[in-house]
Amino acid sequence: MMRAWESRPDCSVVDEPFYACYLKETGADHPMREQILASQSTSREAVAKRLSAAAMTDLQYEKHMTHHMPRGIDLAWTRNIKHVFLIRSPERVIASYREKMPSVSPDDIGIIRQRELFDEITELTGQRPPVVDSADVLANPKAMMREICAALCVEWVDGCMTDWKQGARPSDGVWAAHWYGSVKASSGFSAASVTPAKLSAQDLALAEEMRPHYAAMATCKLPRP
C-alpha cells in the first residue's frame, strides 16, 4: 500500500513513524533495534508534531502499525486526518510474522488493538473510517484502490497506483533491510495466494482467538453497500 501511494506524483509517504517509540517503551527485542532507535525520535509528542506539520506534497500517506500505538496514548492529533484501516486474515498475519520472528503473541500482531483503535478513531472523528481487506486489494487492485480514493475523497490518478518501479525507496524505514525483501522486489500488487497458510497447532489456536476481532472489522470493509 505504501508503494501505491508513493507512486502518485502528489503524495509523499511516512513509514512507521512510531516504531522507535514502541521499542523504547516496551524494550521489545526486534531485529535492528539499535539502528531503529537511532533513526527516529523516541518522543511521541515530537513525532505527532512533525506529522501534524504541513507536508511537502498535497497528500501525505502515513503507514502505522497498531502495536506501535498502545492503549492510553493521546490521539487528539489524528482528529483531522483521514483514516483507513487495512485488515488481513489472522492466519496470513501470523504466517507473515513467523517468517521473520521466532515467536508470536496477540500483542505482536495487533489485531485486538486494531479493533480498539478503530473504535477510538470513530469516536474521536465522529466518522467510521473505511476498512480494506488485503485479500480484496490483491484480488482486484485497481478497483479497490479506486474505492479507497473515493472513500477518502481523493482524486484517482490512473496508471500509477497499481504499478511502480522495483527497488528500495529513501522513504523506507531503516528496518527495510530485514522486513522489506518482497516489497523491494515488487513492481505492483502480487496475486492473492490461494494456498492456505501453514501454521502450528499453537498458531492456529491464536488465529481462532483473533478471528472475532478480524470478523468484526470485516463487516465495515469496502466496498460499502
Q: For each of these PLM feature ranges, what is it?
A:
Residues 1-20, 145-165:
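Internal hydrophobic scaffold segments of catalytic domains
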Residues 1-56:
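PAPS-dependent sulfotransferase catalytic core
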Residues 21-23, 93, 166:
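Generic structural signal for helix capping and beta-alpha/helix-loop junctions
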Residues 34, 104-108, 201:
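Charge-dense, low-complexity intrinsically disordered segments
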Residues 39-48, 115-118, 183-191:
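Short, basic, helix/turn surface patches
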Residues 59:
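Short, Asp-centered acidic motifs that coordinate Mg2+ and/or phosphate
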Residues 62-160, 174-182:
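PAPS-dependent sulfotransferase catalytic domain
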Residues 155-225:
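PAPS-dependent sulfotransferases, especially Golgi type II membrane carbohydrate sulfotransferases
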